[in-house]
């Protein structure tokens, strides 16, 4: 599985998800819901420091695509902290959704633009992939963290990693150390490394592979993983845990 390029692109599901949520739980028309987003896409917003850093890290790759450079770079450079970023193309796409609902995205001008670019880059997406897309209603996974229940989206999303991180962090006296103390930050960073090592090792599409969700979210598993954190040294390389009977589902 490549890490970049057209073959990493799946059928976009957000718009269908918004529509399903609105029909089930909402009362406002989609045009009202999208008005603020359209405003910020068209008029712009100041870029925050962390977003500017992420943009800077991706600037070389964005520069390789004329369309991406035109959309996401400002006069050839990534948006800097405090600069106003505008995305009029996104505003136009959102207006079509506001006017026609999901058909304003999965059919018509936006859909054809998606398919045209996919074809140009050697992708395999077809009209039917967009027109027939349906979101899935799923049951969340959860853990507890110091008495609080925390829910996340189940695999094949990465939500399980956040829950595993919390379980590992629960093994340490974070509050006693102070939330922004060096000790606490060290444990948070190392817990993230451990959680993502297990994520990449065991989590894939549940339609095609068995995923040990209960085991990964057990407190015993977190306690064992926490033992791998050196309190005085950052791990240069983190190995996934070994769970008997499971193989690498992510490829």
What are these regions (language model features)?
Residues 76, 172-251:
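Internal maturation/activation junctions in enzymes
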Residues 1-107, 111-157, 174, 217, ...:
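Noncatalytic scaffold domains of N-terminal-nucleophile
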